[in-house]
């Protein structure tokens, strides 16, 4: 097809999806696309082009959603976190000399050579580092302030198994990856519905944090989800399409804190959320009764 741009006529190709089952969405709006997707799209393109000439398009296509999620996380990281005590990084404080990706699928591995300014002002020299690249995720601990109960989920975790843990089933807060175009709170609400069939009445931020910044890029956005658990039963659920096998537990707040004390609540999002719940529990209960 020929198009006219700035008064000049030029030939253009039109992409038409092979899948005849594609359904029509909302009317496309350029300004809305730019606002929501442009920077994510550019970050996505940077990673995709690293595979140019190395990976066939049909192999890369199933990875696109994961690549977009990583691209969005890199964009979210550009927010300005507080630097009241720690060093405030400026231009030239960190230099990336080289980057390699020996593996990229749902997650990615990157080999970096970086250098940074030391606390004494000297240059660190080239440092070889490997990082595990994972997109941002949201976690939510459902709490009923009327019954003073929480909902935990339990599932097999391959990370615990790979470490050699003889008990690789993990008690956790509800959690999931933040999908491209989705906010952390939207992801928390969606995951509560998918994993436990819950509708949350309020979402209270716990905090955002790296779980292991020495080796992993994953940044967690944790919430406490206020909800009514009076008619919710423990059971088995999860999305079949994602091979999820999830068991839910409705337990008292005191039982939760006993799990924290014993070490059975052995993962950072649950520990952090439980301790924050302990700090704010009286306020939640007062608001529910008032």
Outline where the language-model segments fall.
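Glycine-aromatic micro-motifs
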Residues: 1-90
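Short amphipathic beta-strand and strand-loop transition segments with alternating hydrophobic
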Residues: 92-103
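Short, well-ordered beta-strand micro-motif
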Residues: 111-113, 142, 224-226, 250-252
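Active-site-adjacent beta-strand/loop module that shapes the phosphate/pyrophosphate-binding cleft
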Residues: 114-118, 212-234
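Conserved Nudix-box catalytic region and its N-terminal flanking loop in Nudix hydrolases
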Residues: 129-134, 141, 146-190, 240-242, ...
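A short coil-to-beta-strand element that immediately follows conserved catalytic motifs
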Residues: 199-206
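NUDIX/MutT-family hydrolases
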Residues: 237-264
């Amino acid at each position: 097809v020929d198009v006219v741009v700035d008064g000049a006529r030029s030939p253009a190709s039109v992409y038409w999806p092979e899948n005849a089952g594609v359904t029509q969405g909302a009317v496309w709006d350029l300004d809305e696309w730019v606002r929501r997707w442009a920077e994510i799209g550019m970050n996505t393109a940077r990673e995709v082009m690293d595979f140019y000439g190395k990976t066939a398009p049909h192999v890369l296509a199933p990875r696109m959603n994961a690549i977009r999620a990583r691209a969005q996380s890199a964009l979210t990281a550009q927010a300005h976190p507080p630097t009241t005590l720690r060093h405030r990084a400026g231009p030239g404080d960190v230099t990336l000399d080289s980057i390699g990706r020996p593996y990229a699928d749902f997650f990615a591995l990157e080999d970096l050579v970086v250098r940074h300014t030391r606390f004494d002002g000297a240059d660190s020299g080239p440092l070889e580092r490997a990082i595990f690249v994972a997109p941002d995720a949201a976690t939510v601990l459902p709490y009923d302030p009327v019954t003073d109960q929480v909902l935990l989920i339990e599932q097999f975790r391959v990370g615990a198994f790979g470490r050699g843990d003889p008990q690789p089933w993990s008690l956790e807060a509800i959690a999931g990856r933040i999908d491209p175009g989705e906010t952390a709170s939207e992801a928390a609400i969606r995951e509560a519905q998918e994993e436990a069939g819950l509708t949350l009445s309020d979402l209270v931020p716990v905090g955002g944090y790296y779980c292991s910044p020495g080796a992993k890029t994953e940044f967690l956005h944790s919430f406490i989800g206020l909800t009514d658990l009076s008619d919710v039963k423990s059971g088995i659920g999860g999305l079949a399409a994602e091979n999820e096998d999830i068991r839910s537990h409705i337990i008292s707040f005191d039982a939760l804190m006993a799990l924290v004390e014993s070490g059975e609540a052995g993962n950072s999002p649950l520990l952090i959320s439980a301790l924050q719940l302990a700090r704010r529990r009286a306020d939640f209960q007062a608001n529910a009764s008032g």
